[in-house]
A protein has these predicted regions:
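N-terminal membrane insertion elements
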Residues: 218-220, 240-334
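Immediate post-signal peptide segment of exported/extracytoplasmic ligand-binding proteins
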Residues: 1-22, 123-129, 279-290
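Extracytoplasmic small-molecule ligand-binding "clamshell" domains
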Residues: 8-82, 86
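Acidic, polar ligand-binding/catalytic clefts
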Residues: 63-124, 135, 145
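Pocket-lining segment of extracytoplasmic ligand-binding domains
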Residues: 129-131, 135-236
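Extended ligand-binding regions for polar small-molecule ligands
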Residues: 36-45, 113-116, 202-278
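Bilobed "Venus flytrap"/periplasmic-binding protein-like clamshell domains
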Residues: 15, 19-43, 103-174, 189
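Short, charged amphipathic alpha-helical "coupling" segments at sensory-output junctions
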Residues: 325-351
Length: 351
């Protein structure tokens, strides 16, 4: 009886907390458009769990997912293909009102000052200064390099000096308008969002390399890739993943027109990631950027230097060999002259 009483008096176990990592920016409305209602949906579907939203920068979200500091995360398709190698599971793909196909819903757009006559096409971006989010950003950098790979075999060396702002949207537009850079790279639909909020006058900015209009509602300069993916760590049980996925896929569309749908084809994303050697956990700064950018020029310089050293060595050996022969000839001539002089002296004595 006493044992039974003690078991009854034991406190109820605290609910497990599932940490959800999401990208956060003051101008990125993902949380209000979809994430807040998504968390409420998950709480109602799985009341025994507490869901903690962890807002992070894009790079910090990447690190948190890799280090298993979050249990669930919403990431780009590019980052997901990197994480799935360690067992991450896609639960659902975001469905946005801007695209009829969630498999073609995210890309990049090149912007420049409207009065900059130097830049009228994507090829004009060669050697131009650029502002972008970060070298780890899939939609804000890698997708743009994928478009440039249609022009050159070395897309990473195509642009001029790159200025990474660590924040997308307005900081990039301001850098372009203030002539700190020649052009900027935004993620698709960011430009329209800034214009709609009155933060950017549409007649001050032009889109470079605009793709033809199709089922995608926003301006773009690149191909499109799958939308954001809601994923889970490999450490979560299959039952939890199944319940999470069911709750997401059965959720009605939000008031803003966003929702979740079944997974998209990631083959094009994987191809792009492999082709460009996408390493989202490597933060490139300072010398690393310079070395990566000018590695071919450095290689050519090293080869030229090595060739110069070898040529100098060969010339030195040739000069030394010929000098030795010349000295031998001079010595031989001196010896002959000495012998001739002695002979003349003897002949003079005989006379």
């Amino acid at each position: 009886y006493q044992q039974a009483s003690s078991e009854v008096r034991k406190p109820a176990p605290q609910p497990a907390t599932l940490r959800v990592g999401v990208y956060y920016s003051p101008l990125f409305t993902f949380r209000t458009d979809l994430m807040d209602v998504t968390i409420e949906r998950l709480k109602n579907a799985m009341p025994e769990y507490a869901f903690q939203v962890v807002p992070l920068s894009e790079f910090d979200l990447t690190v948190a997912a890799v280090k298993h500091e979050v249990d669930l995360f919403v990431v780009t398709s590019g980052l997901y293909t990197y994480l799935e190698t360690s067992g991450a599971t896609a639960l659902a793909v975001r469905k946005s009102p801007q695209s009829q196909d969630p498999g073609k819903a995210m890309g990049a757009v090149f912007i420049a000052r409207a009065d900059d006559a130097r830049i009228t096409s994507t090829s004009d971006l060669r050697s131009k200064r650029v502002a972008a989010l970060s070298p780890q950003s899939f939609a804000g950098w890698i997708v743009a390099l994928g478009e440039i790979s249609n022009i050159t075999q070395y897309p990473k060396n195509f642009f001029g000096k790159a200025y990474f702002k660590d924040k997308s949207g307005m900081p990039i537009v301001e850098a372009v308008l203030n002539k700190e850079v020649d052009f900027g790279i935004l993620r698709t639909c960011e430009f329209e969002s800034l214009v709609a909020r009155g933060l950017v006058a549409p007649n001050t900015i032009k889109v470079v390399g605009k793709k033809p209009e199709d089922t995608f509602a926003c301006l773009r300069s690149t191909d499109l890739y799958p939308d954001l993916i809601f994923a889970a760590q490999a450490s979560l049980s299959p039952d939890i993943k199944r319940r999470l996925s069911a709750a997401l896929l059965s959720m009605p569309m939000s008031e803003s027109g966003y929702g979740w749908t079944v997974g998209a084809n990631l083959s094009e994303t994987r191809h792009l990631v492999e082709r460009l050697g996408y390493s989202p956990t490597v933060r490139m700064t300072g010398p690393s950027v310079m070395i990566d950018r000018y590695k071919y020029a450095l290689l050519i310089g090293v080869l030229l230097l090595a060739a110069a050293v070898l040529y100098s060595f060969a010339v030195s050996r040739t000069v030394a060999r010929r000098t030795k022969k010349l000295v031998e000839v001079i010595d031989e001539k001196s010896e002959l002259e000495k012998t001739a002089r002695i002979d003349r002296e003897r002949l003079s004595q005989l006379e």
